[in-house]
UniProtKB/Swiss-Prot annotation:
Sequence similarity: Belongs to the FlgN family.
Subcellular location: Cytoplasm
UniProt entry tagged with the keyword Cytoplasm: yes
GO cellular component: cytoplasm
One of the GO biological process terms: bacterial-type flagellum assembly
Name of the protein described by the UniProt record: Putative flagella synthesis protein FlgN
Domain of life the protein comes from: Bacteria
Keywords: Bacterial flagellum biogenesis, Cytoplasm
Function summary: Required for the efficient initiation of filament assembly.
Signal peptide span: none
Entry-linked InterPro entries: FlgN-like, FlgN-like_sf
Length: 135
């Protein structure tokens, strides 16, 4: 049972780390001068944490089968409390992710509008897959 508790604690820690990264990403997106490298570094860190989270989730599922106990772990108060924290953190992550998505979409829209207005009205200016301008 201690293995399951340790695994759930690790999942909780990873989720808190993801929360900090998403808040930092939001802050960077709101700044007017943020380099792409800063955003890409945050994305790399998120990918690493998601890989760890997937592995821990698989371990958790195996341990649940072994101990024959499943979420929300009502028979075990300690596990139940950790699980509630995980659920709350996941809800916060969902809100932060949606907020970041909205900010990125607005920035992209404003950049696209500026590029269209700054060039002649007959030329279409867009970004290609490499992030370079195409006219």
């Amino acid at each position: 049972m201690n293995n399951l508790i340790d695994t759930i604690k690790k999942i909780e820690n990873i989720l808190y780390s993801l929360e900090r990264i998403l808040k930092q990403e939001c802050h960077n997106l709101l700044k007017s001068k943020t380099s792409n490298e800063e955003i890409l570094e945050l994305i790399k860190r998120k990918k690493i944490l998601f890989k760890k989270l997937i592995i821990l989730s698989q371990d958790r599922l195996c341990l649940e089968k072994e101990y024959n106990i499943f979420p929300p772990y009502e028979s075990n108060n300690k596990l139940n409390n950790y699980w509630k924290k995980i659920i709350n953190t996941c809800l916060i992550l969902r809100k932060l992710n949606l907020k970041n998505k909205i900010i990125m979409n607005k920035k992209f829209y404003l950049n696209q509008r500026f590029l269209e207005l700054s060039s002649s009205y007959k030329k279409s200016v867009t970004y290609n897959l490499d992030g370079n301008l195409e006219i």
